[in-house]
Amino acid sequence: MMAKAIKNETELEGMREAHLMDGVAMSELWWWLEKQVREGNEDLNEFNVGEKVSSLRAEQAGYVEESFPSIVGEGPHGAIVHYRATEKSARKITKDSIILLDSGGQFLCGTTDVTRTHHLGTPSAYEKMCYTRVLKGHIALDTATFPVGTPGMALDTFARQHLWSAGLDYRHGTGHGVGAALNVHEGPQSISPRWGNTTPITDGMI
């Protein structure tokens, strides 16, 4: 498992290339989504946004398929772990919407899994506070210095500390391994509060 989890330089370069192409598709998606909202598209909903992000990824060179079904959650649906919109359940998306988009692609060179949260209008003070605390957690984790052999369980606290100080939390892991043109969820490493999560986070892991 560890031999697969620790990527070689060819795999790492392929993953960088995959994320560049994925980034193009995601940028196009958010531009399109904001345009639809500005123009007042009343048919805009979670389901057709999921279809749109898949079609934009498919335009990229070396695209194979989705790495998992896209998760598009508007408002309260964004808090449902692994939510999947259907044509019947899909909530409308408007200028007042907070959108969570969790999606990814399988490319010949690598695999992506990207989660982003956007407000399409003017967020409330509480929404800004929550978003800022999550962002501060991302920055704390990204800039953390830790000794060799530190497991993801210990690092998870960096991501949650600013939420905890406000009495907030999220019932989900912070991060998981991603395969190089393989499974989008790859172990044994993860960054989560699970006590059995003792695999050290090592150079070359994604």
Region locations from a protein language model:
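Active-site neighborhoods and metal-handling regions in enzymes and metal-associated proteins
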Residues: 1-206
